[in-house]
Amino acid sequence: MGRRDAQLLAALLVLGLCALAGSEKPSPCQCSRLSPHNRTNCGFPGITSDQCFDNGCCFDSSVTGVPWCFHPLPKQESDQCVMEVSDRRNCGYPGISPEECASRKCCFSNFIFEVPWCFFPKSVEDCHY
């Protein structure tokens, strides 16, 4: 087997594994609430929106100079809670429990330090692909 054949076989193997993995399409809020300058590339030059979404990524070609296929914001319990950490408005106090936060009808996520863990939700009216 020549070098070119090995490269082709490797490319087909990677594509096959990607197809088997099958990712869930992100929600509109996971895509549209991410600032263009914070996008992390998730595709290759010339990728289509369908290919991008099939990989579990977001697609938006309306802004030049930034990736069009990009990784989404992390999934939350509710789309109202999907936002960049810089957009969080505090709804609690240091050490608040998830239960107390929920009783205030707020969102809770304690994965990132030095940002509000209990924060106000946002309307999903502004979310779009």
From Swiss-Prot:
Q: Where in the cell is it found?
A: Secreted
Q: Which cysteines are joined by disulfide bonds?
A: C29-C127, C31-C58, C42-C57, C52-C69, C81-C107, C91-C106, C101-C118
Question: What GO molecular function annotations does the UniProt record carry, in alphabetical order?
Answer: CXCR4 chemokine receptor binding
Q: Which InterPro entries match?
A: P_trefoil_chordata, P_trefoil_CS, P_trefoil_dom, P_trefoil_dom_sf
Q: Give the P-type domain ranges.
A: 29-73, 79-122
- What domain of life does the native source organism fall in? Eukaryota
Q: Identify the keywords attached in UniProt to this record, alphabetized.
A: Disulfide bond, Repeat, Secreted, Signal
Name of the protein this chain belongs to: Trefoil factor 2
Tissue specificity, per the record, is:
Stomach.
Function field: Inhibits gastrointestinal motility and gastric acid secretion. Could function as a structural component of gastric mucus, possibly by stabilizing glycoproteins in the mucus gel through interactions with carbohydrate side chains.
Q: What is the lineage of its organism?
A: Eukaryota, Metazoa, Chordata, Craniata, Vertebrata
Q: Which GO terms describe its cellular component?
A: extracellular space
A GO biological process held by the record: negative regulation of gastric acid secretion
Question: SUPFAM superfamilies annotated for this entry?
Answer: Trefoil
**Record-linked CDD domains:** Trefoil
Q: Where is the signal peptide?
A: 1-23
